[in-house]
Design a protein with these regions (language model features):
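Conserved non-transmembrane functional hotspots
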Residues: 1-116
Length: 116
């Protein structure tokens, strides 16, 4: 039951991330929205690390792939934040060298739905 509840949180964080990214783009890619995305990604990592050992091997691979993307994204994020020391309305843009693994997200969501 606990693992299902933790996995269920991911549905919220995935949707929140998509919504926050849309707002980030719509509002000029500012630091305020980038901070919301960073917090959301940190929350995703927290959940993924809790459920990893309880998931089947193929889902563990998806978790590792998604975690890798977020790790690289977060490294770029921290580097730019340190360099710019931005205010909320400042533009905050960097290019992540690792694309978002949509299939991994989809596999994790489908795994959760199979448990419910």
């Amino acid at each position: 039951v606990k693992m299902k509840a933790e996995l269920g949180k991911l549905l919220f964080y995935f949707e929140r991330g998509r919504n926050s990214y849309t707002k980030y783009i719509e509002h000029g890619s500012t630091y305020l929205y980038a901070r919301i995305l960073k917090h959301n990604n940190d929350s995703i990592i927290e959940v993924l690390s809790k459920v990893y050992s309880f998931c089947p091997d193929e889902i563990q691979q998806d978790i590792v792939e998604l975690t890798y993307h977020i790790d690289v994204w977060s490294s770029h994020w921290r580097c730019l934040e340190k360099k710019l020391n931005p205010r909320f309305n400042d533009q905050f843009i960097f290019h992540n060298t690792v694309g978002y693994p949509k299939r991994a997200e989809s596999n994790i969501v489908n795994y959760y739905r199979g448990l419910v």
